[in-house]
Amino acid sequence: MTENSVVEVDEGVFESTAVIDNGSFGTRTIRFETGRLAQQAAGAVVAYLDDETMLLSATSASKHPKEHFDFFPLTVDVEERMYAAGRIPGSFFRREGRPSTDAILTCRLIDRPLRPSFVDGLRNEIQVVVTVMSLNPQDLYDVVAINAASASTQIAGLPFSGPVGGVRVALIVSEDNKAGQWVAFPTVDQLENAVFDMVVAGRVVSGSGDNADVAIMMVEAEATDNVIAKIADGAQAPTEAIVAEGLEAAKPFIARLCAAQAALASKAAKPTGDYPVFPAYQDDVFAAVEAAASEKLNAALTIAGKQERDDKTDEVKVEVLEQVAPNFEGREKELGAAFRSLTKKLVRQRILRDQFRIDGRGVTDIRSLSAEVAIIPRAHGSALFERGETQILGVTTLDMVKMAQQVDSLGPETTKRYMHHYNFPPYSTGETGRVGSPKRREIGHGALAERALMPVLPSVEEFPYAIRQVSEALSSNGSTSMGSVCASTLALLNAGVPLRAPVAGIAMGLVSDQVDGETRYVALTDILGAEDAFGDMDFKVAGTKDFVTALQLDTKLDGIPSQVLAGALSQAKDARTTILEVMAEAIDTPDEMSPFAPRVTAIKVPVDKIGEVIGPKGKMINSITEQTGANISIEDDGTVFVGATDGPSAQAAIDMINAIANPQLPKVGERFLGTVVKTTAFGAFVSLLPGRDGLVHISKLGSGKRIAKVEDVVNVGSKIRVEIADIDARGKISLIPVEEGNDEAAAPAADEAASE
């Protein structure tokens, strides 16, 4: 990597650059520019990835704080502009509308490391808007957006302890290097050869340059869709040790990005403004609450059951607030915040000193587990997974591949065959609230569960279905997203989906503090909701028994020692193995498909025969659909997906398609049960096979007697037994009727096709 530098390219326009060296994979250049665009924003930075990818980030702040808020009002928005890819939006109004899933997930990637970097108690509204203005189709913009948002916030004069650097690193393997190399800012083509892909964000806490100490703040990682094929070919599996190596590999890249942002800020940043902060409580309030509540609250926190513990804690809170409130009139909000802080302190102390948790478990214990399948009668697949008080219902629906989601975004993905939707109704925590369209959190949790399962899904050739998986969080007390992974694995197997391996997930936590003069770290397996809120880390790991398929980490600490992280990963694997064993007791192989699920078969026809299968204005394919009741979808490569509610209907449609695409000429003397498709003055045209008609002359219709009109004997739609009398040089077929009772030789294939 070359040294970072900042230059004034024009009057008041500054630019800094970070060059990322990927060795044999080349270099990537990230350039930050400020002073040219969006000059009325508090801070505005344009970030470039090489020459063609360009994002504008603008950070603004309200002039007055929202004193009545008890949270930090930070909003992050990502605006995908279709002109960035030279496209017109596909919506009815041909204008960008609601944000895409990619944009929402990028908002979350930005928010998670930025939010804890602001000073505690800030109540001014802060908005960061990132606009994607140009995008090379080989680039993924999300990590560029993290850096752009951090840079614009760093120069905005806000109480912000950045900069924050974000990088995507992928473990890319090749024929010459099966162990792989961690490559920063990989292209879409390079990701095709990767086994693992992770977005890592962090900041420099001490040092500089190659000696910088980088604290990891956020990780979003996944195994690639083709990881199992790569492993079978000899590639390195993304085990816990490999994932830990990837996190270390990301740190020098993050340091370089932070240095470039800091260099830009040294020339262009505004002085930090005078922003008032509103501490949750003053020291005198905490001291009074601690003196009044410690003993009773400690006792309440030993109750194992969540509902009973919460009820007792609320009871203690009411008693204590009534006791101390007269001394703090008008400061009731502080009392509530102090009580919460005391609860956090006591929970953490108990874990650190006694290795004991609020529900009575040890630090590595998993709550009671339960798994059951076939819960919903008419669903194609369903399962109920319970871990303690967390209860997830997974439901699988199968349909034709044409029902795959069409994606209109700037990402490389245009369709999604596997769709994972996560719902978190308010009753899951015993509360009331809004229901309806999903919130960002629900979209993020669904995406995490989706990424965990994608590597083990069968290919469309192996299983020609679109799959919708819904996770219903019926009860929540810790990691419903990882519960969704477990419930989804069970439901998919119940639906008959041939997964390459079952996947389970677990949420890990971490508590750290000074104990007897040294920093002590305790990793927690299967954290509760309270341990998530009061702990220092939320670390979700999903995978098979052999490797990690998805990982998500958020931490409040300025760095986690490598050995602590490795220990947490090892604990997570042990827990995952235990959960997989419980799941296997419920179901360990794919069930028979539900009778309510469609039967979908994929066949191939020559590309030059696609037009014949469709027919003029869709006449032929519509006729097959009407006769058999099957749904038919034809791809440009000649793949035909045939779906029906039962096997015979699907087979009848397949036979009719094959008769057109791969025809076998009938022979003289063959007999058929045909259908009259047209009558003329000289005879009746009879359909023998799809696309193959013959003529019964009027002179042959009267059983030796002369008839005036064809319609006196048959009409369109009539069934008639016929025999091929002649096939001329042009392939035209002449037919003669066959007397009923003398039709034993009638072609059985024709009988079957006609009877459908």
Curated annotation (Swiss-Prot):
Q: Where in the cell is it found?
A: Cytoplasm
What InterPro entries does the database record attribute to this sequence? Answer: ExoRNase_PH_dom1, ExoRNase_PH_dom2_sf, GPSI/PNP, KH_dom, KH_dom_type_1, KH_dom_type_1_sf, NA-bd_OB-fold, PNPase
In its keyword annotation, does this UniProt entry include rRNA-binding? no
> Which reaction equations make up its catalytic activity?
RNA(n+1) + phosphate = RNA(n) + a ribonucleoside 5'-diphosphate
Q: EC number(s)?
A: 2.7.7.8
Chief location of this protein within or outside the cell: cytoplasm
Pfam entry (one)? S1
MF term (GO), any: polyribonucleotide nucleotidyltransferase activity
- Please state every residue range assigned to the domain named S1 motif: 669-738
**Which residues are recorded as binding Mg(2+)?**
532, 538
What cellular component GO annotations does this protein have?
cytosol
UniProt keywords (A-Z) are: Cytoplasm, Magnesium, Metal-binding, Nucleotidyltransferase, RNA-binding, Transferase
Top-rank taxon of the source lineage equals Bacteria
Q: Which Gene3D superfamilies match?
A: GHMP Kinase, N-terminal domain (3.30.230.70), K Homology domain, type 1 (3.30.1370.10), Nucleic acid-binding proteins (2.40.50.140)
| Domain (KH) ranges | 598-657
Its BP terms in the Gene Ontology are: mRNA catabolic process; RNA processing
SMART domains according to UniProt: KH, S1
Entry cofactors: Mg(2+)
Tell me its family. Belongs to the polyribonucleotide nucleotidyltransferase family.
Known function: Involved in mRNA degradation. Catalyzes the phosphorolysis of single-stranded polyribonucleotides processively in the 3'- to 5'-direction.
Protein's recorded name? Polyribonucleotide nucleotidyltransferase
Q: Which gene encodes it?
A: pnp
